[in-house]
Amino acid sequence: MEQTESIAVLIPCLNEEKSIVSVIEGFQESLPASQIYVYDNCSSDRTAELAALAGATVRSQPKIGKGNTLRKMFADIEAEHFLLIDGDGTYVPAEAPLLIKKLKEENIEMVVGRRNAMEHDQKHRLGNKAFNWLYRRLFGNDFTDIFSGYRTVRALPFAAKSPALSFLCE
C-alpha cells in the first residue's frame, strides 16, 4: 500500500483525453494538498499521457470495468479520505471541498455529489429521476443523483475487498 496525503482524488478513466486535463487542473486548484490518481482502464486514446503531463499519478488497470478499477484503486492507495470522480468533466471540482467538509463535520462515511446540469438525453434524466424516487421510497434517503460518479468516502479497511465495488451502475 502506498501512503499518500489525507485526501486522494481517484479518477478511473476510459478514453477521456478531451476532458482529463481540465478535470485534473480543477482538483489541483480546489484541493491543492490532495494527491491525484488517474487509473487508465485500457484507453485507446492519449488519456494516460495527458494525465501524466497534467501532474497526476497515472496507473494502468488492464482488467476492464469501472468496478474492477475502483477496487484496484482502493487496494493500491492509502488515504484518510477518497474523492471519486469521473474523468469526463461532468462534475465541478470546485465543489470538492464542500463534499469533504460535509463528510468530516457530520462524521459520516460517504457523501454523494450530483451533476448540476444533467447533460443526458431525456431518457437518462427520466430514468435517473425514477431510480432516485424509488431509492427514497425504499430507504428514506434523499438522493438527487443516485448514479453520481462524484463521491467522497472515509477510508474503510474493507473497501478493497468489498464485493459491492465490483459492480457500479452508470
Identify the function of each model-found stretch.
Residues 82:
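Short aromatic/hydrophobic "clamp" motif used to bind/position activated sugar donors
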Residues 35-37, 48-76:
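Conserved donor nucleotide-binding strand/loop of the catalytic core
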Residues 18-22, 45-54:
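Acidic helix N-cap motif at the loop->helix transition within catalytic regions
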Residues 15-29:
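Short, well-formed alpha-helical segments that are part of the catalytic scaffolds
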Residues 40-48, 89:
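A conserved acidic beta->alpha catalytic loop
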Residues 69-70, 74, 90, 120-170:
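Conserved catalytic loops of nucleotide-sugar-dependent glycosyltransferases that act on lipid-linked
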Residues 97-122:
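Conserved donor NDP-sugar-binding/catalytic core segment of glycosyltransferases
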Residues 11, 24, 33-42, 59:
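Short beta-strand/loop segment that forms part of the nucleotide-sugar
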